[in-house]
Amino acid sequence: MLDIKFVRDNPDAVKENIKKKFQDAKLPLVDEVIEKDAKYRECLKEVESLKAARNKLSKANGPLFGQLKKCTDEAQKAQLQAQIDANNAAVKADADKMAELEAEEAKLADRIQEIMYTIPQMIDPSVPIGPDDTYNVEAQRFGEPVVPDFPIPYHTEIMESFDGIDMDAAGRVAGNGFYYLLGNIARLHEAVLAYARDFMIDKGFTYVIPPFMMHGNVVQGVMSFPEMDALMYKIEGEDLYLIGTSEHTMIGRFIDQTLDEATLPLTLTSYSPCFRKEKGAHGIEERGIYRIHQFEKQEMIVVCRPEESADWYEKLWKNSVELFRSMEIPVRQLNCCSGDLADLKVKSCDIEAWSPRQQKYFEVCSCSNLGDAQARRLHIRVKGKDGKTYLAHTLNNTCVAPPRMLIAFLENHLQADGSVTIPKVLQPYMGGLEVMVPTHKKG
């Protein structure tokens, strides 16, 4: 969300940014919001002017009442009363006019906010320009992708060989997009989360378990309306939504707060279940646990000064790379293009893991710099040493989301005999287990 003053002062730049995001339908909104803002500010001036006039008239009535009380001349009393009545009539007229203006002011304010929530954040100059994710740009690779000399089964087949997943039962219980994890697969799921938690704590992040629901005003503060509609589950009859990612309640923690600059940066890592309506397009790669309604995730967020956010962006995505490489999974960084950025994002990149089965990379983490967009919506301010306040910057990144992580892990550590090796960093979280041996082999 942009500052309205910035839009007023830089309409051409705002329009150019909209074009870069291939959202030309929003271009008329820039002129509309500038026009509405001018009317809004004029309303404010008129209301203040009327308030001043009303106060002046009300103040003038004081001495007139005093004179009227002491006056004995009937003609003069009538004249004083007439003046008081005229002042009262003017005060009432001003009050009626103020009520009209304040109603118009509220209407304008609502429309201005609606538009400002729709106009996208200014993207970073380094963001590649393109209409959709096919224009995302590979930046660099970490680790050598390996294509084994034996066939890699689909991830659910690997899990089934360990008696580690039951999607049929989950379908009967909750429908499509849910799963039961069992035995060593469930244990591996928890091991990855526990390792990621400790990995981030060792990086100096504070571990947090946040609320798994949030109010509507927090939802609107952390994400765009299209995202909200496509993602969020609402609790019927309640002003509560199930979180789609813990970053939302983590950032929401600071709503309407003024933070002491000396406490920044705030570096937090959180565990949560996540709930999402989206299931994705049907097809072979949509089977299994790649895109689901419920999953668990370890997240990282940063609240910092504006001048620090670019550096923190680099640190956050590199944390993900280091984490995946420590588990011996090849990854690459993919810079998201302008058309693939959500409206609140200044810059974003995906970390993608190598899939030996598909012989291509797939998304496992997403790192974003949101600038002051969330802070502006949620009123998260910072008080500097000079006593002045400014908006914080917020960033987030997936540390690890085990459903997709498990796919990458199982494919990259699968052996020809169907066993799965456990890298050294995970062995303490698996009771010292070095190799997972399948319960049975399909076929």
Say what each PLM segment does.
Residues 1-145, 160, 164:
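N-terminal alpha-helical targeting/anchoring segments
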Residues 27, 141-443:
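TRNA-recognition modules of translation machinery and tRNA-sensing kinases, especially anticodon-binding
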